[in-house]
Amino acid sequence: MKKTLIILTVLLLSVLTAACSSSSGNQNSKEHKVAVTHDLGKTNVPEHPKRVVVLELGFIDTLLDLGITPVGVADDNKAKQLINKDVLKKIDGYTSVGTRSQPSMEKIASLKPDLIIADTTRHKKVYDQLKKIAPTIALNNLNADYQDTIDASLTIAKAVGKEKEMEKKLTAHEEKLSETKQKISANSQSVLLIGNTNDTIMARDENFFTSRLLTQVGYRYAISTSGNSDSSNGGDSVNMKMTLEQLLKTDPDVIILMTGKTDDLDADGKRPIEKNVLWKKLKAVKNGHVYHVDRAVWSLRRSVDGANAILDELQKEMPAAKK
């Protein structure tokens, strides 16, 4: 009888212990969430997510800075053209989830992510679909200015539980920004960023990420938003169409030409616009203040690392701006 009682007591204790353990586990599961406020609301993100999918290129750098390699990236199926080669090496092995404008829900779901980072402008209409797959935060990158990018970096850091690491990164960035401002003498010179020039001149407006960065180091941006922004490509309102006559009227002190594989080039490697009589009348052309830069860095890499890369180029590649 005693033996039976002992056995029953042991079994009862085992059941109670298991029940307590299960209850504790469920409680911990609920507790181990981080409430993240973003552009489309508030999302509870699992603490320290490891399987992260990004739907805009600028978010890649931020994750890498925080020690996380994304498992999925919306790369428009042309990663070599759009992603910096050094960054591409670091994320080797990721899965493409299609285009940034129309990411594949099936591919995203197949990766079983525990966090999706979407772009506010591009993915607002599919946000409800995304959050059914995994916790999703939406941040501004496509139309982000400089401060938007800093804010998004801090939000991502909170979502993955690495705020201290990002604060350290931003402190170093601020030091580089100050150093660049001291090394170059912009003296409020007007500057203009130009992308494609095949059919019409596509300039970035004052609200663009790189435009705002340039004003941080002392330049004055040559144009302001005037209602003629291009809203194609998922709401890309930071683009402004200009004619050569309008450009000549603006006549910036410095022109930065962002190059890429979509640009029409002559046999000698020049854009047809560079041989136009009106182009040659521009102040920046006459004074040798036209600079050719990589579009993947100056336009697509909207991140703290992207900003640092631009600051490095400003210090090294623009001698006319040096003291």
From Swiss-Prot:
Protein's UniProt keywords contain Membrane: yes
- Give the way it sits in the membrane: Lipid-anchor
InterPro entries documented for this protein? ABC_transptr_periplasmic_BD, Bact_iron-sidero_bind
Which subcellular locations apply to this protein? Cell membrane; Membrane raft
Tell me the leader sequence span.
1-19
Q: Which GO terms describe its biological process?
A: iron coordination entity transport
Which residues does the UniProt record annotate as the domain Fe/B12 periplasmic-binding? Answer: 51-322
Keyword match Manganese = no
Official protein name in the record: Putative ABC transporter substrate-binding lipoprotein YhfQ
Q: What is the organism of origin for this protein?
A: Bacillus subtilis (strain 168)
Give the organism's phylogenetic lineage: Bacteria, Bacillati, Bacillota, Bacilli, Bacillales
